[in-house]
C-alpha cells in the first residue's frame, strides 16, 4: 500500500502493518498472484500472458496494473549511490538504511511526497534540508499564506528549507556516494 509508505518511513508502522492481503488471502480467493514478473506478451485470443522468464498464465479476466515511475531530476549525479527515489517499499527501506548510517539528507522537492519523506527522515534522526524550485512549498496545493504556516510548523520540527533553488548537479564524495548538491546561480 503505497499511501502508507510514509508511516513506515517515519517508524510509525511496519511493512507488515501496511500489507493489504497476505499470501493466504490470494490462495483462499482462487487468485494466482505472480509477483516480480515482467510481462512481455499478451495473447488476447488465447487469453494468455507471457513473462520474460518464460512464465505463462491463462486468464478469464486480465487486470493490467502497470504502476508508475518516480520523476528523477535529469542532472549529472542522479545515478550516484545514495540518490534514492520515493515510490515503493524498496525505496523506503533504502531511506531507512540511510537514516541509520548517515546524518544529513537533502530532499529535492517540497510537494506532498517530498515533505513526507523529509518528515520521516527527520523522525529517524537525520538533519534534513528540503530544496524546492518554487517560491513556496506545495505551491500546487496551497496558497502562500497556508504554505508559510506549514513551513513554519515543519521548521519547528527541525526541517530546513532552501526555496527558489534549481539543482544543477549532485556531487560525489570521496567514497563515491552523493555528498553535495550544486545549484544553478
State what each model feature region is.
Residues 1-32, 120-145:
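Beta1-alpha1 glycine-rich phosphate/pyrophosphate-binding loop at the start
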Residues 5, 9, 73-75, 83, ...:
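Short clusters of hydrophobic/aromatic residues that line enzyme substrate/ligand-binding pockets
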Residues 21-106, 164, 180-185:
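FAD-binding core/adjacent interface of flavoenzyme oxidoreductases
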Residues 33-50, 57, 123-185:
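A Rossmann-like FAD-binding core segment of flavoenzymes
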Residues 113:
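Hydrophobic/small residue at the entry helix of a nucleotide-binding pocket
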Residues 116-117:
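Hydrolases whose catalytic domains are alpha/beta-hydrolase-1, hotdog thioesterase
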